[in-house]
Amino acid sequence: MASAATIETEKYSLLEDFNVDVEVDDEEYESFSLCFWVYLLNSTTFPSTIIRQVHSDMSVSAPFLVLDENKKMMLLPLTLLHKEAPDPVDTSSWTQVPSVSTKSKFPLEKWVHVGCEVSRNFMRLFIDGNMEGEQFVTSLLTKNAYPECPRKISLFSVGGDGYSVQGFIQCAEVLPASDHVEHHYMKDPPLMLSVNKSSSSGIKLDDCGVWQASCKEMFSLDVLLSNAIGQPVHKDVEVVASLLYADTLPEAKMGEAEAPLLIRDEGVQFSSDDRPIKLLNGRSSFKLKISQLSSNSDDRLFWIKFGIRNAKDYPFLQAVSNPIRCISVSPEVQPVSVTPKRLTNIDHLSSTESPDLLQNTSSVKRIRLGKESVSGSEESYQQCNSHPQTSRQFENGNGMRLHEEDNSSIDSENSEMRYTISDSTIFKYCLGNLIDKALLLKEITNNSSDDEVLEFANQVSLYSGCSHHSYQINMARELIAEGTNAWILISRNNQHVHWDNVVYEIEEHFMRISKCSSRSLTHQDFELLRRISGCYEYITQENFEKMWCWLFPVAYSISRGLINGMWRSSSPKWIEGFITKEEAEHSLQGQEPGTFILRFPISRTWPHPDAGSLVVTYVGHDFALHHKQLKIDNICESSERYMDAKPLQDMLLAEPELSRLGRIKRSH
């Protein structure tokens, strides 16, 4: 039987790898069309440059295809052909030159066909085979004029981790004038897995429009494999269903007695992991049931995730259902309230945690490591792996908390309390993506007292089952205020500031917030910060805010608890600076098992629940590289609470997987 290899995954590539050259002096390409399919992730921010242009006479590249602040795509003149082309040095000039723009917002998490038709006298922009607009321009070139001028231009994307645009591209081609954009649109559309939400059965809707499924009843969802223009695709592939926690994204796991998600096939129930379903004519119906995970799972939100078996981990070859609230139904139970209930403490492992590293067999808590979740979509909620704070907590000698369940009932008077910040706002925050969360927190901190923000943080932690949300919410007011003041000092009312003039102010703020004046940031640190901001020679407020949402949580973490001492240490240098996952992996190539490097992951930006966290990258006993997030209760509490605690480095070296500190190898 054919496998998932029947899907040609090699034709999909990262947007950051896109690069084509065009010979505009070639008679066939005096007018040309750049055509491609693009899939942008939700982590894309606006404004952003999708494709840039450069030729041999340019020292700095200029934008060619951009997304503006209103999420509309704009096609700009070509520097080699058009007098109206944007100035590569003046980053604001592209907003002032003639351009062709889409009429509506550019969609994310969806395949879109883009066609850019360029000639010496006009430009046309096509979306999904339809012309969005046309702009006439003035030609710079004439026949046999300026023979010394370059005739080849490169079009490329910068994309990638830490930049503002991340996504995938397929079937990118430069076509001569004789080929039509519409033909390319129909030629080889990319594939996409989806859930047909309109055909679901056994699912109920509450008053908020949230799906509800009983732990005791089957429900069905149809999964479709189609191309980007909506045609069913007949591929001999199998699809596997799994259950995810909607707040933290790891797979739901129970003991060995029962699987969290069951599937019925030929009248028999199986664990969904053990029973992939084959697609027939591009479609299959999944009959599913969520197990009775525990009484504490009532009202908790889940997603059903579908993925093609043995296929690469592309987001467009995966699909998720709407959030589903798992409820228990019995004659004695009253109808479920629309308001989410508080979650009691559920102490379970996510699918990506390592049990041997998490297990505590003594009265003294060890450091806890949880595997870092790596995903193309930054706004998707990465693994948080924290516990709801609904238990009584006692501290041991290391300042780390042991949990004791409190089974006493909640006082009826307290359960009826109403706070200024509504339950619907709390619910919206729990379900929102990172951009939604950030906007909500800005509004809440502007209109609420400190006590109200603290109560909001506690409620979000209870409803979502993730205490790390509380940490990000509680720092929101300070993060926003510090960032606003920093930009005022940096910009001095200028919209664009040269990067060299920003470095000093950034370092001053970082050293003050991190409470560590003895260690300065290095050139490599600033280069990574510039990469995170997405800027080049000049930085805008949008660039600064992207960088600040990563830097502030890191500085905040360094100022607290056990990390501060490690950051201050110069011999050995436990945390060498701001490094990428790729740099850490490169440095550990060929090292002995147990060698490790500590880093702040650049994919975690505020208000992600793990923003500012530390990740340990190490060589395992299998000589493979592993990435795990440090899991220490109260690691970001004030350092005064750790006067009797062991140094963090001692606790790290006590881990069986870790034995020696590695060093960073720079490629330059």
From Swiss-Prot:
Residues 574-642 form the SH2 domain. One of its GO terms (molecular function) is DNA-binding transcription factor activity. CDD domains: SH2_SHA (cd10338). Residues 373-411 are annotated as: Disordered. Expressed in roots, leaves, stems and flowers. One of its GO terms (biological process) is signal transduction. The keyword Phosphoprotein applies. It comes from the Eukaryota. Residues 374-396 have a biased composition (Polar residues). InterPro entries: ConA-like_dom_sf, SH2, SH2_dom_sf, STAT. Keywords: Phosphoprotein, SH2 domain. Phosphorylated on tyrosine residues. This is SH2 domain-containing protein B. The lineage of its organism: Eukaryota, Viridiplantae, Streptophyta, Embryophyta, Tracheophyta.
